[in-house]
Regions:
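Amphipathic alpha-helical repeat scaffolds of TPR domains
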Residues: 2-25, 51-72, 99-112, 137-142
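Residue-level detector of alpha-helical secondary structure
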Residues: 10, 14-17, 21, 32, ...
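Helix-turn-helix repeat elements of alpha-solenoid scaffolds
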Residues: 27-40, 75-86
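Short, charge-rich amphipathic interface segments used for partner binding and complex assembly
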Residues: 33-44, 108-112, 125
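Conserved structural position within tetratricopeptide repeats
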Residues: 40, 46-47, 87-94, 127-128
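Alpha-helical repeat scaffolds
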Residues: 77-90, 118-127
Length: 142
């Protein structure tokens, strides 16, 4: 359980994401396989250091990609995967509770999972945090 292993898995996952993004427009199945492999690396990075928000959030994003793929196939498992992605976003948010972007991502996942009350709550949290960020930026410029 070393920092080197964490970085190795994180970087390997990032490289696979880049490949998946390139493949997505021409070969969806290849992109999906690359996202799944990236997700495995993000999972291992997250397990190496569960205090790092980046690996936790990237794992959520990998699960979102899989949820989208399942949704595109009209699979009943899509809702479960969206719910799993939402839970992983919440875990990432717990590691960085000031990140409105993560809260908004959790809101989106809950929405696609059909969990509308949770989606609304997470959206409000995200809007609040992102509004604070905008106000702080305005105040620092003025």
């Amino acid at each position: 359980m070393t920092e080197a292993n964490y970085e190795h898995h994180l970087q390997a996952g990032e490289a696979l994401v880049a490949q998946a993004q390139q493949a997505a427009t021409t070969d969806f199945q290849r992109a999906r396989a690359l996202w799944q492999e990236a997700g495995k690396h993000f999972f291992h990075a997250h397990k190496q250091d569960e205090t790092q928000v980046q690996a936790a959030f990237r794992l959520a994003q990998a699960w979102m990609a899989e949820a989208y793929a399942l949704q595109k196939e009209a699979s009943a498992n899509a809702l479960v995967m969206w719910s799993n992605a939402a839970a992983q976003c919440e875990l990432a948010f717990d590691l960085n509770p000031e990140d409105g972007r993560i809260a908004m991502t959790a809101a989106s996942c809950h929405h696609f999972a059909g969990e509308h009350d949770a989606a609304k709550a997470w959206k409000q949290i995200g809007e609040h945090l992102l509004g604070q960020d905008a106000n702080e930026a305005d105040n620092s410029q003025g």
